[in-house]
């Protein structure tokens, strides 16, 4: 960034770990980051018609956030959300959420042996448009009269480095069960307003509607699907010790 905070240049290193950029003379602030390492920041002064080098930059391994203690933890719905995004007529994105859900995480001594179970009330789907929500609850989509819940049981926790995890398990939706992996960023531990311990994470997954036989479709005159074939699911979760 330059002296007034504007981003001037960015990018990655070459295969040998070098990064070169041509910038006007002036004062700059530099930030270097890499997955699993603490960011490096420095100031640099570039003189007119000269080469400025920072030399070798060494990144320090980042300390991973503290993990939740072994035991049972509940999803705290007031400060959690389960949302989704779908494409509409190949252009806009429609955002929605489920307003009612519950879940428990059993943290093992070996964190990778942990397990979680989440139950979502299918009828609580909400896109802020009543007519659309009624259609999503109908047999064309979730068919909530026959399949009142969506359930995820995750039993494979794999550490991918830094604060990144993969949680793999079985998702049951619309009477069909498929293996799904949640790409998860663990955000660490904190304390709530009453001093209670909390842990938090963000997770995403991409679902293909046809995998769960949610296959209703209408085409526009040009052959463009009204509803896209994939759904992006986004979770922001806080957990508290069960008690």
Predicted segments with their positions:
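Low-complexity, acidic/polar, glycine-enriched regions of mature
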Residues: 2-243
